[in-house]
């Protein structure tokens, strides 16, 4: 049996724990199985269990994960009777990236399963709540066919649900213009319009971020005045 499990979920949704559960189930059924777990956080945690985040570390983790994926698929193709499980448990917010991974493993003959996590546990790495909620919304807006929604053991609180509602309502409101700063890229836009842009941290100056409209904005023609102003903006 050769299987690929894609786990999607915001920070603190229980992805890592669920991945361990699925790995144990597979190992119990196929005792000689090779388990390959791909997750950026695992690659950014040292041998002493210390998590070290940086833009450079993320890039290295992604490259390491991609290389491990390629190598494991190659082993699977060369050994079709070998029991292998690949678990990919990053947040996996982009549906296009998920589809690419699924197409890739199917070409190598792997069976696939997709799971979406909905828990709201405290995330281990101090990600701001707004960023967590934005990731949750983005996942809702970027669904993948045949994904299995895992019932939450610890669902969102009433307060979190209200914040999610406010963030979603933001998209229905006209843009506000900050007269003092002479910009459409307001604090409110940065807080609630995050699905429309990416913020990439500088490797040399990690406190700075470069803003750029999301690729989906281009494909869906969802440009607004803030996004037109934003390209290449550094904050």
Q: Where are the model-predicted features located?
A:
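Loop/turn-to-beta-strand initiation segments
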Residues: 82-86
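A structural signal for short, well-ordered beta-strand segments and their strand-loop junctions
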Residues: 37-39, 87, 113-115
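Conserved glycine(s) of the Walker
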Residues: 14
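Acidic, metal-coordinating catalytic cores used for nucleic-acid/nucleotide bond scission
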Residues: 87-101
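Residues that form ligand- and interface-recognition hot spots within folded domains
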Residues: 9, 22, 90-92, 116-119
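Short, surface-exposed basic-aromatic patches at helix termini and helix-loop junctions that form
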Residues: 24-28, 99-113
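Conserved GTP-binding G-domain of TRAFAC-class P-loop NTPases and closely related GTPase folds
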Residues: 2-4, 8, 107-235
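Conserved substrate/cofactor phosphate-moiety recognition/catalytic segment
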Residues: 17-81, 118-125
């Amino acid at each position: 049996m050769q299987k690929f499990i894609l786990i999607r979920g915001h920070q603190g949704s229980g992805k890592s724990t669920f991945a361990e559960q699925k790995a144990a189930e597979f190992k119990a059924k196929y005792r000689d199985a090779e388990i390959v777990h791909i997750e950026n956080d695992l690659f950014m945690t040292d041998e002493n269990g210390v998590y070290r985040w940086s833009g450079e570390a993320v890039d290295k983790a992604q490259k390491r994960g991609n290389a491990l994926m390629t190598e494991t698929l190659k082993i699977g193709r060369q050994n079709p009777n070998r029991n292998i499980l690949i678990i990919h448990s990053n947040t996996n917010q982009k549906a296009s990236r998920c589809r690419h991974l699924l197409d890739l493993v199917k070409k190598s003959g792997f069976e696939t399963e997709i799971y979406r996590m909905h828990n709201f546990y405290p995330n281990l790495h101090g990600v701001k709540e707004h960023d967590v909620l934005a990731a949750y919304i983005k996942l809702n807006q970027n669904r993948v066919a045949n994904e299995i929604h895992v019932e939450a053991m610890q669902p969102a609180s009433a307060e979190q649900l209200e914040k999610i509602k406010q963030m979603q309502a933001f998209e229905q409101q006209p843009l506000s213009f900050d007269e003092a700063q002479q910009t459409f890229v307001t604090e409110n836009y940065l807080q609630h319009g995050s699905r429309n842009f990416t913020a990439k941290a500088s490797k040399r100056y990690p406190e700075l971020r470069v803003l750029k409209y999301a690729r989906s904005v281009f494909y869906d023609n969802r440009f607004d005045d803030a996004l037109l102003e934003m390209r290449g903006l550094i904050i």
